[in-house]
């Protein structure tokens, strides 16, 4: 990983803008494993120029009920798409272009804390810390 992946993403975004005058979102991507799932999927290690998370709380679900805890991990979802297109083996490509994703572009600086939660809020960490009693 870069020493400061958020700075690296911002530098790439600025270079693209200065060269082409196009506003883009940049997501630096790696692959990850998911508990109880076969295979890898993409994960955003940083981003710039794109809102990383969409707060869906108080929006309606399919039945018209308000959502209470839903945050959509926009850049992680896009990272999975990009990871699939970039590949994992000898065929891998250094970048992917994802268009018309509906992600919200922004000029504000993205902070690493926006894409993470405290360990005590994480269902995986809590589950490991509190194993079921037999």
Predicted regions and their residues:
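Phosphate-interacting basic helix/loop segments used at nucleotide- and nucleic-acid interfaces
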Residues: 1-20
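A structural signal for small-residue-enriched, beta-sheet-centric alpha/beta enzyme cores
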Residues: 24-134
């Amino acid at each position: 990983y870069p020493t400061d992946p958020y700075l690296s993403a911002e530098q790439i975004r600025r270079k693209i803008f200065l060269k082409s005058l196009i506003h883009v979102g940049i997501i630096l991507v790696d692959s990850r494993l998911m508990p109880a799932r076969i295979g890898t999927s993409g994960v955003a290690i940083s981003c710039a120029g794109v809102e990383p998370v969409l707060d869906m709380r108080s929006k309606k679900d399919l039945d018209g009920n308000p959502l209470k805890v839903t945050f959509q991990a926009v850049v992680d979802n896009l990272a999975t798409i990009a990871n699939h297109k970039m590949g994992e083996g000898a065929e891998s490509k250094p970048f992917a272009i994802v268009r018309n994703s509906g992600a919200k572009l922004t000029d504000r600086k993205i902070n690493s804390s926006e894409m993470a939660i405290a360990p005590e809020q994480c269902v995986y960490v809590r589950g490991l810390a509190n194993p079921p009693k037999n």
